[in-house]
Curated annotation (Swiss-Prot):
It comes from Latimeria chalumnae (Coelacanth). The gene is MT-CO3. Residues 1-15, 67-72, 153-155, 224-232 are mitochondrial matrix. GO terms for molecular function: cytochrome-c oxidase activity. GO terms for cellular component: mitochondrial inner membrane; respiratory chain complex IV. Its main location: mitochondrion. Its EC number is 7.1.1.9. This is Cytochrome c oxidase subunit 3. It catalyses: 4 Fe(II)-[cytochrome c] + O2 + 8 H(+)(in) = 4 Fe(III)-[cytochrome c] + 2 H2O + 4 H(+)(out).
């Protein structure tokens, strides 16, 4: 029987990276097929494979960390660095969208009528649904911090309640955003304004859905006694991600909804 003389987790061979990559290929190809041919077969296949991969990969990580004890202090430190680098990469991802927006809006071309918003575009009122969305996300940032402090202080019941409220607020934000899209007077095909608006806010909406999923998994794990007051990196990573989503929304609201209108 082999014994390891170090504190690092030597991961077993896993099929989930390749199934996850295949799911990503199917989803992106499916999006193109949906836009151009109105066919949703590929995207549904991709989403199904993605959900199955997420479930089984999360199951394996929970088994390795919670039940087998592979997530030692050095491993947790490495995971923290990994999460920080991931969020940094996401910052630059959104930086590209803001660059596209400001490039188009600060010096509108003659094709846009020389003004911003372009001629023929009726922008959304920033003090209606977008302002409510801002309040909802800021409230969710408060409740996720409440959950984190409750967890660190061993207040299990309070942590579950506050995390549940955070998930509800995240789902409410998504519902409000979907309603706003449905009732929007312009589309993604309406030139530079439509494309920058829907791509930037749409990718943020996708991040809210991902963050909500992350928090739902943490909520289920919390009810199953997977977290302790000093060992809960899974929740910590979800909270960092949620705060990042909050901050991006504030920049989106000020730039695209308020200044851009």
């Amino acid at each position: 029987m082999a014994h390891q003389a170090h504190a690092y987790h030597m991961v077993d061979p896993s099929p989930w990276p390749i199934t996850g990559a295949t799911a990503a290929l199917l989803v992106t190809s499916g999006l193109a097929a949906w836009f151009h041919f109105n066919s949703m077969i590929l995207i549904l296949m991709g989403l199904t494979l993605l959900l199955l991969t997420m479930y089984q990969w999360w199951r394996d990580i929970i088994r390795e960390s919670t039940f087998q004890g592979h997530h030692t202090l050095p491993v947790q430190k490495s995971l923290r660095y990994g999460m920080i680098l991931f969020i940094t990469s996401e910052v630059f991802f959104f930086l590209g969208f803001f660059w596209a927006f400001y490039h188009s809006s600060l010096a509108p071309t003659p094709e846009l009528g020389g003004l911003w918003p372009p001629t023929g575009i009726t922008p959304l009122d920033p003090f209606e649904v977008p302002l409510l969305n801002t309040a909802v996300l800021l409230a969710s940032g408060i409740t996720v911090t409440w959950a984190h402090h409750s967890l660190m202080e061993g207040q299990r019941k309070e942590a579950i309640q506050s995390l549940f409220i955070t998930v509800l607020l995240g789902l409410y934000f998504t519902a409000l955003q979907a309603t706003e899209y449905y009732e929007s007077p312009f589309t993604i095909a309406d030139g530079a304004y439509g494309s920058t608006f829907f791509v930037a806010t749409g990718f943020h909406g996708l991040h809210v859905i991902i963050g909500s999923t992350f928090l739902i998994v943490c909520l289920v794990r919390q009810t199953q006694y997977h977290f302790t007051s000093n060992h809960h990196f899974g929740f910590e990573a979800a909270a960092w991600y949620w705060h990042f989503v909050d901050v991006v929304w504030l920049f989106l609201y000020v730039s695209i909804y308020w200044w851009g209108s």
